[in-house]
Amino acid sequence: MSTNLQIGIVGLPNVGKSTLFNAITKAGAEAANFPFCTIEPNVGVVEVPDHRIYDLAGIFNPKKTTPAFTRFVDIAGLVAGASKGEGLGNQFLSHIRETDAIAHVVRCFDDENITHIEGGINPVRDMGIINTELCLADLESVDKKRVKTAKLAQAGIKEAKAVLPIYERVFQVLQEGIPARTLDLAEDELAVLKELNLITLKPVLYVLNTAEDDIANPIDNPYVQAAAAQAEKENAKWVPVSAEIEQEVSELEEGEAKAFLADLGETEPGLNRLIRTAYAMLGLINFFTVGEDECRAWTVHSGTKAPKAAGKIHSDIERGFIRAEIITYDELIKCGSFAAAREKGLLRVEGKEYIIKDGDIAYFRFNV
């Protein structure tokens, strides 16, 4: 797999979370109208939408084409009290801790046949319930660390004195039910908190699940308006998706799916938007390796230097890195072949300090 990016899908029971997950993976997780139907966290692997890998495969005709992938983890329905072990709380909070980001599915549709665990439809309330549970779970781990660090600070331990204010500050906001990610934490402060693996430090993408009729103009839906305003207050990203449409699309052949979406006035599935938004939110980019054996997309964080990117392929390449030969996707597509690109002098030789750009095609020279 080209990436280990992992996104946890959370949401209250019966908001459309399992329906969305089914569409993502075509895995058919049991989406019954019952609060705790998703007992084990399902993991699904989905291709990152990027036409460039297939364009490159068209030039090289490789034996194998490997796009980038994202892992989605469907985490069972959280409810009020989950942080205290109610519903299916504790084991699921530990699953969320293992993810890079959280996709929080929020119900923005009316349907009297699908019960809501809290009674009526109120997306802002639902967002608050889940955020409160995640804050409470983090509060417990921060408090333990804070108490322990305070004792060490009192005993005159210099390092403890230096980091105690960080734990105090995070503890304060979590007590108020505010996620830690809303704090403007410096790199060194984040490094101190890293070992706690706080859930509320993870970036959140609100997936606003709308009715099929609303997907053309989701912002006209008052539920979407309320949820989007709340997301913006939290400096969080949001994306409107109709889980029902996504499930229908996932069951169609490619041609039929395009026609179905076109009838709805859409050019692509909402899932593509979801994945792209998650990529942008996490600052991720793709670079490529090409050849007759394989054309492959690799995912790294924006700002990654060439040796580190090479390490994605194999640790030996990072260890013995000599240089990278780089050409951009656009240049190679224009030239039509490596030979033509070489003739035009478009292949650049870059050293250890080179920062990989989105769409770079890289050939790494190394010696171990």
Segments predicted by a language model, with ranges:
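Conserved G1/Walker A P-loop phosphate-binding module
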Residues: 1-112, 143-144
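C-terminal-of-GTPase-core extension/linker across diverse P-loop GTPases
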Residues: 1-10, 15, 21, 148-355, ...
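Amphipathic alpha-helical transducer elements in NTP-driven molecular machines
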Residues: 36, 50-53, 66-72, 86-100, ...
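Short Asp/Glu-rich motifs
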Residues: 39, 115, 250
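Conserved Switch II/interswitch segment of TRAFAC-class P-loop GTPases
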Residues: 44-49, 76-86, 97-158, 173-186, ...
